[in-house]
Design a protein with these regions (language model features):
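N-terminal alpha/beta PP-like core and its mobile active-site loop of ThDP/TPP-dependent enzymes
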Residues: 3-4, 9-382, 386, 423, ...
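Phosphate/pyrophosphate-binding active-site segments
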Residues: 4, 176-179, 217, 340, ...
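Active-site diphosphate/adenylate-binding microenvironment
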Residues: 44-58, 395-485
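Conserved short loop/turn motifs at secondary-structure junctions
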Residues: 47-48, 256-260, 408, 412, ...
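Thiamine diphosphate
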Residues: 142-156, 353-354, 362, 369-370, ...
Length: 650
C-alpha cells in the first residue's frame, strides 16, 4: 500500500509554472545593484546567437520576456551578435563603462558556440569585470548519447565542452534539474555583484532542462537588490599603512583599475593634494588623474614614461591602489630597484593586497583612501618640496617628448602611428572614449596619451586580447546611451592584425545604428610582435603580411588586401586618408558623424621614420639560450644583462 501524500498546507506558497529558461530570464529581469544610493539593473540585456542548444529554451524565454505582457521594467532586451567571443567582449565593455554596477548576459548553443566563450570569459575574469554566460549544454537525461556537437569523454560521462569554462569563471554551475536553478542563480548574482569576487559567471544549461516546466515559488521573482559594499580598512592595517607612509622619503602611488571600479578618482586627487605623493598609473588605472594634474606622472612599467619609471627605481615606498602588479608594471621584477623598497597595497581583494610581500590594506579603494587621508591629516605628512620639484620637472621634460612624437612637420607625408595619435589628441575633448587592447598601440597610448577624463582611456591590457576593440566599443556605446542625441564619441583603435581577428561586430553596430568610430591603422603586419621579434633575435620572422618570396619567407610585396573596402562591405561609411592633412580632416568628419564610421589610414613604418620613445623599462621575454644566428646570440647577451637585475620582493 502506497503511503498517503502529505496534506497540502492551508496557505500554500504561491507558484508560477514556467520552464527553467523562462524562470531564469524572469529572475534576471528583477535583479538590481545598489551603491551610494544609485540603483540599476544588474543584468541590463542579453546577447545571443541561437542554435539547437538554446533556441527552444532561452530563445523562447526571451520572446516571452519581451512580448509576454511584462511591464517595461521587467523586459529583457535582446542583442544579436555575430561571434560568441565578441559578444562577451561587448558585455565586458559595457560592464567596465558601467563601473561594474551593471552587466549583461550572453547565451549560446552547445559545442563551438560554447567554446567560443572561453577567451572572452578569461578576459572578463582577469580584468575583474562581471559577465553572465549561459551556454547550452548536452541533455541531462541523456536520451541519446552523443547528441550533435557533443564531446565524448570516455573516462567521465558528465563532462562536456562547457567544462572548459571552469578555470576562467569565478563561479560555474551546471543546472541538471529545474529546482537547482534557485540556489545557483542566487550564487551567480552574488558573485557578479561582489567587488572582490566578480568576473565571468557561467550557468551551463542542458537543452532538456531549459525547456522543462516547474512550479516556481513567486518569491523567486521578487525584485532583489544586491548592495555593492565598500569595506573599510582594518584598524591595525590602517595604522601600519600610516606609519609606513610617514616614514617614507620617496613614496610613489601606483594607481590601477581598482581606482576606477571604486569611482575613487576624486578621493585619490584629494589624497595627493594633501600629501603631494606622485601618482603613476597602470594601463587599467590611466585616467585616475587627468594628464595635467600636478601629481600625475603617467604610465608606469615597460610601457610607461621615463618620469614614472625613474621615480619607481628610487622609490622607498610603493603604494599600490587597486592594481595586480603584473610583469608590465614591475618590469618583470626589475623596476623597483631601491634595496630597501617596501610595498603598501590598498586592494579590495586580499589575494592582490599581499603581492610583493606588501603591507596589506584590504579595503575598497575609495574607503581606504578616505581613511588614509583622514589619518594623515592630523599628523602633518607631506613629501619634501625638493621631491615634488623633482618629479614636476621630470614631468615637464617628458611632455616635450610627447610633443615631439606628435609633431607633424610635413602635412603632405604619410603619418606615423604616433602622429595619428597626436592628430586625435588635437581633436578630442573629455567626452571622447578611446578603446584599444593589443598590438603596438597600447604601448604608445600608455606613454603618450593625454587622458582628459576618468573613463576616456579604455585599454584592456589584462588579457590584451586582439579583437576586443570593436565589440567593446559597442558595449561602451550601449552603456553611454548611444541611441540618444547626447551620446559620447567612442573610438575603437585597431591595427590591421587586430582588425582581421574579429571585424564581425561591425555588422551589429550597423544593425543597431550605433555611432561607432573605427580607426584602422594599416601597417601590413603584426608590428608590435615584429619589433619584439627583432629585439629577441627572431628577426621579425612571420610577422609581415607579405607574399612569399623564392626561398619561402614572407618578404615579397604587400598583400593586396583592402581593409577599407572590407569595412565598407560590412556597412560602415569609410573615410580614407593618405596624408597628415587628409587624416586631420577625416578624423573631424568622423567625430561629427551620427552613424557608424571608419577612418582608414596607412601608417609609415618604424623602419623608415623614427617612432615613439623607446621602452623605459625591461620586459622578460626569454631569449634562446643557444643559437647559431648572430642576432639571437646578441639578443641573449642583452637578456642575460637585464635578467641579472631581476629580484623577488620579500
Amino acid at each position: 500500500m502506497s503511503p498517503k501524500s502529505p496534506a497540502s498546507p492551508k496557505n500554500p506558497t504561491p507558484t508560477r509554472r514556467l520552464t527553467t529558461a523562462q524562470a531564469l530570464v524572469a529572475f534576471l529581469a528583477r535583479q538590481y545593484t545598489e551603491r551610494d544610493g544609485r540603483r540599476q539593473r544588474l543584468i541590463s540585456a542579453t546577447w545571443g546567437i541561437f542554435g539547437h542548444g538554446n533556441v527552444a529554451g532561452i530563445g523562447q524565454a526571451l520572446v516571452e520576456a519581451g512580448h509576454g505582457g511584462n511591464g517595461a521594467a521587467h523586459r529583457m532586451p535582446y542583442l544579436q551578435g555575430r561571434n560568441e567571443q565578441a559578444m562577451v567582449h561587448a558585455a565586458v565593455g559595457y560592464a567596465r563603462q558601467s563601473g561594474r554596477l551593471s552587466a549583461q548576459a550572453v547565451t549560446t548553443s552547445i559545442g563551438p558556440g560554447a567554446t567560443n566563450l572561453v577567451t572572452g570569459a578569461a578576459l572578463a575574469t582577469i580584468n575583474r569585470l562581471p559577465v553572465l554566460l549561459l551556454p547550452g549544454d548536452t541533455f541531462a537525461t541523456r536520451p541519446a548519447d552523443p547528441v550533435l556537437q557533443q564531446l565524448e569523454v570516455p573516462y567521465a560521462g558528465d563532462v562536456s565542452v562547457n567544462d572548459c569554462l571552469r578555470p576562467v569563471s569565478r563561479y560555474f554551475d551546471r543546472i541538471t534539474r529545474p529546482e537547482a536553478l534557485i540556489p545557483a542563480a542566487l550564487q551567480a548574482m552574488r558573485v557578479l555583484a561582489d567587488p572582490a569576487e566578480t568576473g565571468a559567471v557561467t550557468l551551463a544549461l542542458p537543452q532538456d532542462v531549459q525547456a522543462e516546466a516547474y512550479d516556481w515559488p513567486e518569491e523567486f521573482f521578487a525584485e532583489r537588490d544586491w548592495h555593492i559594499r565598500r569595506p573599510a580598512p582594518d584598524t591595525y592595517e590602517l595604522e601600519s599603512a600610516v606609519r609606513a607612509i610617514r616614514s617614507a622619503r620617496r613614496p610613489l602611488i601606483v594607481a590601477g583599475g581598482g581606482v576606477r571600479h571604486s569611482a575613487a578618482e576624486e578621493t585619490l586627487a584629494a589624497f595627493t593634494a594633501a600629501t603631494r605623493i606622485p601618482v603613476a598609473s597602470t594601463q587599467a588605472g590611466k585616467g585616475a588623474l587627468r594628464h595635467d594634474h600636478p601629481a600625475d606622472v603617467g604610465g608606469i612599467g615597460h610601457t610607461g614614461t621615463a618620469t614614472a619609471d625613474e621615480l619607481a627605481r628610487t622609490a622607498d615606498l610603493v603604494i599600490g591602489v587597486g592594481t595586480r602588479f603584473s610583469d608590465f608594471t614591475t618590469a618583470s621584477g626589475t623596476l623597483f630597484a631601491d634595496p630597501a623598497v617596501r610595498f603598501l597595497h590598498l586592494n579590495i581583494t586580499a589575494f592582490d593586497a599581499h603581492k610583493l610581500a606588501a603591507l596589506p590594506l584590504v579595503a575598497d579603494a575609495r574607503a581606504g583612501l578616505e581613511a588614509l587621508t583622514a589619518a594623515l591629516a592630523g599628523r602633518g605628512y607631506r613629501v619634501d618640496p625638493a621631491y615634488e620639484t623633482e618629479y614636476t620637472g621630470a614631468k615637464e621634460a617628458w611632455e616635450e617628448r610627447v610633443e615631439a612624437s606628435f609633431a607633424t612637420p610635413d602635412p603632405t607625408a604619410r603619418p606615423t602611428q604616433t602622429q595619428v595619435l597626436g592628430l586625435l589628441d588635437d581633436l578630442v575633448t573629455e567626452e571622447d572614449i578611446l578603446i584599444n587592447a593589443a598590438g603596438s598601440l597600447p604601448g604608445d597610448l600608455h606613454k603618450l596619451w593625454r587622458t582628459r577624463s576618468r573613463d576616456q582611456y579604455h585599454v584592456e591590457y589584462g588579457y590584451s586580447c586582439m579583437g576586443y576593440e570593436i565589440p567593446a566599443a559597442i558595449g561602451v556605446l550601449l552603456a553611454t546611451g548611444a541611441r540618444s542625441r547626447e551620446h559620447r564619441p567612442v573610438w575603437a583603435l585597431v591595427g590591421d592584425g587586430t582588425y582581421l581577428m574579429n571585424p564581425t561586430e561591425i555588422v551589429t553596430a550597423v544593425q543597431e545604428n550605433l555611432p561607432l568610430k573605427l580607426l584602422i591603422l594599416q601597417n601590413h603586419g603584426y608590428a608590435s610582435i615584429g619589433g619584439l621579434s627583432a629585439s629577441v633575435g627572431a628577426e621579425r620572422f612571420g610577422t609581415a603580411y607579405r607574399h612569399r618570396d623564392a626561398d619561402g619567407g614572407f618578404t615579397g610585396p604587400p598583400l593586396p588586401v583592402d581593409l577599407a573596402a572590407n569595412a565598407a562591405s560590412l556597412g560602415l561609411r569609410v573615410l580614407r586618408a593618405a596624408t597628415v592633412d587628409d587624416l586631420r580632416k577625416v578624423l573631424s568628419e568622423a567625430r561629427d558623424a551620427e552613424g557608424p564610421t571608419c577612418v582608414y589610414v596607412e601608417t609609415e613604418t618604424p623602419d623608415t621614420v623614427s617612432g615613439p620613445p623607446p621602452a623605459q623599462a625591461w620586459w622578460d621575454v626569454p631569449v634562446a639560450e643557444t643559437a647559431s644566428r648572430p642576432a639571437a646570440v646578441k639578443a641573449r647577451e642583452e637578456y642575460d644583462r637585464q635578467v641579472a637585475a631581476r629580484r623577488r620582493h620579500l
